[in-house]
């Protein structure tokens, strides 16, 4: 399933997309790092809420972490591990994606 064009995601930035995973429609966070893209479910492990403060609008700390808009949990962007806040030691649920020919696809 095609999720996005790579160029539609700013380098070092985020995008929110909807995808079918199994039988469920899920909101995903896409994070672009050069020609790589990492993806996670748009759900904070602390309280099960979306991480964006408005649809598709994500907070990034000075340290380069994704910050949950609800309770301030901070997630590093390599594996999605929570490094600060109420769910420290937990992690975002990763979703496998791949970049092919300038497009981001669900793997």
Regions of interest found by a model, annotated:
Residues 44, 68-71:
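Short cysteine clusters
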Residues 85-87:
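Axial heme c-ligation environment in periplasmic c-type cytochrome domains
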Residues 1-62, 76-77, 91-107:
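N-terminal pre-ligand scaffold of iron-sulfur
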